[in-house]
Amino acid sequence: MIFLVLWSAASALRIYPHSIAYFNELAALIPTPASPEIPAQEKSSALVRLLNAGPRHGLRHLSDSNIDWGQEDLNLLRWYRRQSGIDKLGVCSNGSIPPGQLGFPLKSVPFDTPAPGWYAIGCDFLCREDGGFRYFRQFTPVTVIGQTMYVYHLTQEEIDARKSSGTIRGLSEKP
């Protein structure tokens, strides 16, 4: 019993101060339906999934305002200001304050087809099956801020490689 209490406390403290995105590690053990763009369970043991779980797996079960309220916009701004070489950042967030008013030098985020540049995409927009930003799932984020804001740097070479391999299509392209 003491072990379970300590585990629960450590689990909650590990994600602090990003508590809205908290998921218990057991979320990694709950099966999810496979999708061509979101891999289902990793082919690893339950113990390995359990030890590497938490908010990373929560997106498979809940999204939208369950996790992403734009709470990481200020942390994204802090991260952006520490970077060099990023002229403009495309931001797609659920925050109530428009990113331009927070001080981001903005660029538009291409809705349907990837374009080179730096982008920060809130997890809600990544999870939507009907959204035009799902193509970002085919790329590896540079960093994840607060478990809800995924930062990508797309290069033309990466985009061309994904398109030529057939792993990425814009919404206007037919499968």
Predicted regions located by residue number:
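Interhelical loop segments of eukaryotic multi-pass membrane proteins
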Residues: F23-I30
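C-terminal luminal/periplasmic domains and tails of membrane-associated envelope-modifying transferases
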Residues: I30-P175
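Signature aromatic-anchored transmembrane alpha helix within multi-pass, membrane-resident enzymes
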Residues: M1-F23, G166
